[in-house]
Regions:
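N-terminal signal-anchor/signal peptide hydrophobic helix marking the start
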Residues: 1-7
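Extracytoplasmic beta-strand-rich oligomerization domains located immediately C-terminal to a leader/signal peptide
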Residues: 11-116
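Intrinsically disordered, low-complexity regions enriched in Pro/Ser/Thr/Gly and acidic residues
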Residues: 80-163
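Short, conserved beta-strand segments of beta-strand-rich sandwich/propeller modules, principally
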Residues: 164-168
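Short, exposed beta-strand-loop hairpins at the edges of beta-sheets
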Residues: 169-175
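Edge beta-strands of extracellular beta-sandwich domains
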Residues: 180-184
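Extracytoplasmic/luminal low-complexity segments enriched in Pro/Gly and acidic/polar residues
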Residues: 188-190
């Protein structure tokens, strides 16, 4: 009887220990997956900005959009993408838009740079686990702006094709707190 009681106590302790290990493993896996999702989203954003191309685009109804148009929670930019063709890879300019609102980060890309009405877009959710976001833009004189092109861009002689020197992204993750990235644009150093 004593042996059975000792065995039962040891079995209960072993079960409790195994249960704790499994719960810890699940928590680590969930944190790892969440961090991986943030890393992929930031890498996609950095890749788009590193391929920024200093060329304005024509909107669907004939409006001219600057090479980059952005505010505190969205950004549209002309980027160069590598496309496969019969003669080999070639660089093609496309328009990419990042929209960060209501805890969702969407990346939208159009197949053409100068749009016609009803040009199809490809939208993809790249992150959905954050509580706050802000974008800021750094000009050639190292001044910060909440929008790009700056409100006084025409008075300062800034061309619509001018890109900022850098873009700062501040993202508040529900799990990891504030994440801040400052991305330099090579095309912005003119």
């Amino acid at each position: 009887m004593v042996a059975i009681t000792i065995f039962a106590v040891l079995a209960a302790a072993a079960y409790g220990g195994m249960n704790s290990i499994v719960r810890a493993q699940i928590a680590v896996r969930e944190s790892s997956d969440a961090l991986d999702a943030i890393s992929r989203a930031l890498a996609r954003f950095e890749k788009d900005l590193s391929q920024a191309y200093s060329r304005s685009a024509r909107g669907a109804y004939g409006t001219i959009d600057a090479a980059m148009v952005g505010d505190s929670n969205s950004l549209s930019v002309t980027t160069m993408t590598i496309a496969a063709s019969a003669t080999g890879p070639s660089a093609t300019p496309v328009r990419v838009r990042h929209t960060l609102a209501q805890g969702r980060w969407l990346r939208t890309q159009t197949a053409a740079l100068d749009l016609a009405p009803n040009t199809p877009e490809t939208a993809r959710l790249i992150l959905d686990d954050f509580s706050a976001v802000s974008l800021r833009y750094l000009d050639a004189q190292l001044r910060e702006h909440d929008r790009w092109p700056p409100a006084n861009a025409t008075l300062e002689g800034v061309s619509p094709d001018t890109l900022p020197r850098a873009v700062e992204l501040r993202l508040t993750s529900k799990r990891f707190g504030e994440i801040r990235r400052l991305i330099a644009l090579s095309a912005g150093r003119q």
